[in-house]
Amino acid sequence: MAEVGTDRQSRRDLLPSKVDPTVFDESFLRQLERLQLITRTAVHGGMKGIRRSVKRGQSVEFTDYRDYALGDDLRALDWNVYARLERLFIKLFIEEEDVTVHILLDASASMATGSPDKLLFGKRAAAALAYVGLASYDRVSLAVLQGRVARRFPAVRGTGRIFQVLADLSGIGASTGATDLAAAARHYAAQLTQRGPLILISDLFDPNAERVVSELAGTRCEVALLHTLSPDELDPPLEGDLRVVDSETGDGVDITADLYTLDAYRQRLAEWQARLEQVSTKRRVSYVPTPTTLPLTELVFAELRRRRVVAA
């Protein structure tokens, strides 16, 4: 925690000339610092922070008593209770420690499409959520999903390390080939050793999208899925005879875009989103529809708070 003062002082260096594409002003950063990513269960951490841990010892929050046993630390004895009951009791505390915040960014080829660009939107959302975690003195682990793997960046701690997160995000480019999101999610889950909030930012354009949800739910983390779609995907401005090409495989299909076709598309899209939300709810995953037109402030301070992904 000794670095906090330096971290806060250095925030003024987050200027457009130095950081692209994720730039936050002082006011936005201060608002982010008042938030915390929610975890509903006690977790094991490796270093003291402000999260609740299942470890017992002398710390900030008293939780219970138990009978003294030979070898217990005598400093934990409650002598006031002994004076009243003439029995030796050990005071139990819950230590508050850090957790690891896992932020997964889908960088498949389809994420580079849309206006605004879905990948750019995802980077900004990832940076904001990373800062929330860093401001809580949690460890933040960033990973990019491409191909069949999850490429992890070194985990960081402390608000001063937001610069490293921004640099990592700025260096991420969209894949030029096909991405198997379910396989990449499974790859990340297999490497995961510390539980905590886990956020996936993705358009979920994958034939096995439901498996992606299942793979991440299996980590027993507090999983949130930010389903990121562009306006053109939600309401395509198409008309006439067209050839629609898959951005990842290059496969194409000829269509005639008329009112009937577009209505059918919107209906199928709504059914797909509803199905993903249903599967997510069943697996205790927070499903958050996230159009790229949604302002970042509204996403973080309204939508994610409403869905209990973050709290003040």
Residue ranges and their predicted role:
Residues 185-193, 197-201, 208, 226, ...:
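C-terminal functional segments of enzyme domains
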Residues 155-168, 259, 304-307:
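Short, electropositive alpha-helical surface patch
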Residues 211-212, 271-278:
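A short, acidic, amphipathic alpha-helical segment used as a generic capping/interface helix at domain edges
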Residues 161-196, 208, 229-230:
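Von Willebrand factor
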Residues 275-308:
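Conserved, well-ordered alpha-helix/loop/beta-strand core segments that scaffold catalytic motifs
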Residues 235-271:
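SAM-dependent methyltransferase
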Residues 2-156, 187, 197-202, 207-208, ...:
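An amphipathic, basic-hydrophobic helix/alpha-beta surface used to engage anionic
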